[in-house]
Amino acid sequence: MFKRLLLLQFLIAGGLSLVFLLPKTPPLQPSAVSMEMPNVLVLSGWTAGPKIDPSKKEVEALSKDTEFSRRNYYRSAGMDAPLGSREMMQASIVLSGKDLNNSVHRPERCLPAQGLNLISSSDLPVKLRDGRTITLKRLKCAGNDNTGKNPYTHLNYYWFVGHDSIKHTHYGRTIKDMRDRLVQGYDQRWAYITVSSNLVRARMEDETGQEYLSVQLSEEETDRNVMELVAELAPEIIDLKKVKSLE
């Protein structure tokens, strides 16, 4: 009887010791992005409005440890535009928490849920100030206002920033995430960065309540604006010294 009790204690102790051999949860590495967007982009002439809170739907749809940063950037339209006209682009950062699947959703699926119809997808290379180039995914969508009588074109540009890399596709980010988990032994937070613009001429109101006339730009003009803005914005919000690969 004594031997049986001793054997049982030995088996229990041995079983409990196996807990220490179980694989540990991989450490969570930070993204190379900063959530603080600059107030002014001097070289390209953009000035940011006040910080914009995430919508109730965004907060409810994403995990609680997801972080948000969003601002509208404005600048005066060209000399040929009506007095007081402005160009506007919205920049947004969504930083994933521990549960990546419930923090960063595939943009091609999110936009249709917002009432936008995806028309086409392409790549837009942007040359940064240090000479390196990052690639943005460019989505062209068709939208309409609340009345359904005023269609417009919506352009959305996005990319992802991980611990040491930049990706411009959902699949590229997923493969990099899996590789780092298996080979490097860590999980990482990913930042989903977007710059977007509605190609519409309309009377608008900014965050301070001031009215202005939004200039309707062409797709080519909007692409140039995005390239100028991102070329200056990206080095301000991304620690490029930590980034080993750009795509």
Locate each region found by the language model.
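Short, solvent-exposed recognition patches
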Residues: 52-181
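A short, solvent-exposed beta-edge/loop patch
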Residues: 4-17, 23, 124-247
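Compositionally biased, intrinsically disordered/low-complexity regions enriched for serine, proline
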Residues: 20-24, 35, 104, 122
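Short conserved aromatic/hydrophobic patches within beta-strands of well-structured domains
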Residues: 44-48
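Generic detector of ordered secondary-structure context
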Residues: 38-39, 65, 185
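N-terminal secretory-pathway/extracellular module detecting exported/lumenal segments
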Residues: 8-12, 32, 50
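Alpha-helical transmembrane signal-anchor/signal-peptide segments
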Residues: 24-43
